[in-house]
């Protein structure tokens, strides 16, 4: 009788455990960890299978354990950039980092500084480490010794931004994993963002979404990134008379386009969650669903509808049927040279 009762109790406990497990899997949303199955064959070799249908890109990325890839082309290392990156409160076990630095004398210095910063984190407590970090070194001709004024000269833009587009594509295609849900492009000179940057942008659940980038000059806020805009009839007419290899640029007196610039419509005390449709974007703080890049939306290195690099990317994403948006009252801050 005692044996019978013991067996009955064990059976009931197993039944309850199975019931709890069933309910858990029934009501728990599918997460990216379910998208990968690792199989080892008899020869000791292993391979991985990813069910891409289970990769979620949702408005609640933490709950759904969605992996984020933060990508930064880096010609100069700003400690404030790294400090701000470490203050992001998205779970680090869901964050992978990708950097690309120039293979030059200046690049070697940047590489050392970046590695030192990474090592301090990755050799620390396990719960403070990033899931994965990759540094690429490549010839890019993007000099870290140029001043901000030199980098933004009108005459230098087509060549400079074409090279930057190639650099971005190399970084993206070398680091994007099958399990990645979101790609956050974060420029190396962005030194201040809300700690909830990833969650705030993902909450809108848009295909492409960019924050508004300003500089702080004392108590004064100055708009910085003019690559996020709504197209104008004037710009379209200018483009219609251009040679196929010419590009339209924004923010230059030499080429007035009269586009609506997101940076110019910022007002204090407005709702930071306000969203607007855009035709062009910058990459200072740009969140992209990984599926958009997988669809083929990259950064054109050549004039694409007379646009190049990030603005060309926005055009390409829209041509592929994806939505492109901005947050005019949600600010991130650029290093003030």
Curated annotation (Swiss-Prot):
Residue stretches spanning the membrane: 9-29
GO terms under biological process: cell wall mannoprotein biosynthetic process; protein N-linked glycosylation; protein N-linked glycosylation via asparagine
UniProt keyword Nucleus, yes or no: no
GO cellular component: endoplasmic reticulum; endoplasmic reticulum membrane; Golgi apparatus; mannan polymerase complex; mannan polymerase II complex
Stored SUPFAM superfamilies: Nucleotide-diphospho-sugar transferases (SSF53448)
Signal peptide interval: none
Lumenal compartment spans: 30-337
InterPro entries: Mannan_Polymerase_Subunit, Nucleotide-diphossugar_trans
Residue runs in coiled coils: none
Topological domain spans for side Cytoplasmic: 1-8
Membrane topology: Single-pass type II membrane protein
This protein's UniProt keywords: Endoplasmic reticulum, Golgi apparatus, Membrane, Signal-anchor, Transmembrane, Transmembrane helix
Superkingdom of origin: Eukaryota
Pathway: Protein modification; protein glycosylation
Protein family (similarity comment): Belongs to the ANP1/MMN9/VAN1 family.
PANTHER family associated with the record: MANNAN POLYMERASE COMPLEXES SUBUNIT MNN9, MANNAN POLYMERASE II
Biological role stated in the UniProt entry: Required for the addition of the long alpha 1,6-mannose backbone of N-linked glycans on cell wall and periplasmic proteins.
Protein name: Mannan polymerase complex subunit mnn9
Organism: Schizosaccharomyces pombe (strain 972 / ATCC 24843)
Lineage: Eukaryota, Fungi, Dikarya, Ascomycota, Taphrinomycotina
Gene name of this polypeptide: mnn9
């Amino acid at each position: 009788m005692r044996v019978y009762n013991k067996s009955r109790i064990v059976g009931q406990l197993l039944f309850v455990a199975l019931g709890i497990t069933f309910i858990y899997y029934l009501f728990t949303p599918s997460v990216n960890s379910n998208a990968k199955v690792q199989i080892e064959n008899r020869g000791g070799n292993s391979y991985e299978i990813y069910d891409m249908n289970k990769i979620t890109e949702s408005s609640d990325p933490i709950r759904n354990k969605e992996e984020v890839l933060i990508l930064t082309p880096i010609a100069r290392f700003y400690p404030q950039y790294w400090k701000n990156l470490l203050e992001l409160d998205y779970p680090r076990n869901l964050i992978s980092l990708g950097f690309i630095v120039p293979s030059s004398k200046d690049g070697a210095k940047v590489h050392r500084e970046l590695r030192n910063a990474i090592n301090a984190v990755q050799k620390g407590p396990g719960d403070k480490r990033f899931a994965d970090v990759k540094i690429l070194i490549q010839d890019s001709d993007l000099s870290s010794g140029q001043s901000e004024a030199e980098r933004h000269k009108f005459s230098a833009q087509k060549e400079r931004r074409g090279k930057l587009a190639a650099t971005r594509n190399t970084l993206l295609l070398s680091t994007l994993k099958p399990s990645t849900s979101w790609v956050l492009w974060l420029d190396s000179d962005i030194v201040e963002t809300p700690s909830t940057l990833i969650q705030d942008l993902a909450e809108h659940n848009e295909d492409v979404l960019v924050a508004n980038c300003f500089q702080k000059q004392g108590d004064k806020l100055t708009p910085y990134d003019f690559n996020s805009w709504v197209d104008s009839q004037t710009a379209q007419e200018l483009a219609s008379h251009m040679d196929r290899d010419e590009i339209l640029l924004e923010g230059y007196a030499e080429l007035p386009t009269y586009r609506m610039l997101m940076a110019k419509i910022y007002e204090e005390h407005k709702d930071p969650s306000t969203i607007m449709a855009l035709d062009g974007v910058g990459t200072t703080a740009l969140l992209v669903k990984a599926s958009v890049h997988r669809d083929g939306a990259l950064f054109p290195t050549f004039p694409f509808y007379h646009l190049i690099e990030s603005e060309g990317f926005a055009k390409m994403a829209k041509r592929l049927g994806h939505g492109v948006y901005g947050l005019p009252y949600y600010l991130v801050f650029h290093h003030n040279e």
